[in-house]
């Protein structure tokens, strides 16, 4: 009997220790997340060169890439030359064991598909792309539809939101088309800019992500649909300046990494109780960037060196710290599955973005080692302190 009791005690202690270890892992370190980059500079027709570029993503600690391709009205299949490039990237990401996400939008905001015919054409294009690229893990439907930079018609003459309902309809059609190709494909919806405002009379009409989510929910409920329209909600949680820490929250209608609770509440109010998950919907931060100061020794690879936008930058050490903070926050946010930084490589024009761990000529920055370490720990669920 004593032996039995001792065995029971030992077993109970072992189980308790295991449970405590699991608790500590969850409470202290968060959950594993995907860490990647949005980077079109890997889109090269030469498979060898594409592979070399993709390998640099692995070197930075990333396990995913997001690339973009363009759709045009009437197009139901990709251009053959573009398809060769996409296949080159898909093969390279597969060989390096990286996930691949493809974002598809149009070159001009007036091309945004708002009619039934246009949306059916876009959905057919996406289905063809998925069949042609069977190793792609997910597809992001459009880019920042809450901005007229990418989705021109935001309001009707009466000042009513017409962008969110049209986008919700596009999501539904494309979701069905992609899932008919493979139920394993992940459909990323939203893909929203972090800021906007409700002013139909503005010369640049936009919507805040807060209002856009609300209007998506209203459109979904009004449609009577009982199936989902997305598997993942994507947000681009840039701060207004690179010097602002990623976790700083917003009091208004903007959304960032520090506004997780507000985002989950919005998604819940929009979709809970319908066929589309809301408060439990996986979330991905698919664009987030922190620009770093370019040293004088590297300026030879850049243009527009006097650009004021190029001055919105922080030291490389701070860039690494802010990326690590973003990974930590995401790992402590239960619904968040991924963070993608923008870019892997700097853009050479200082009037644009210098937010990668590599300079424009693909040389590593001083921030690379710290970003690599943080990314790998985040992927393993060993980075954050969520206590």
Where do the language-model regions lie?
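Noncatalytic carbohydrate-binding groove/subsite architecture in carbohydrate-active enzymes
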Residues: 103, 118-123, 162-309, 313
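N-terminal Sec-pathway targeting helices
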Residues: 1-12
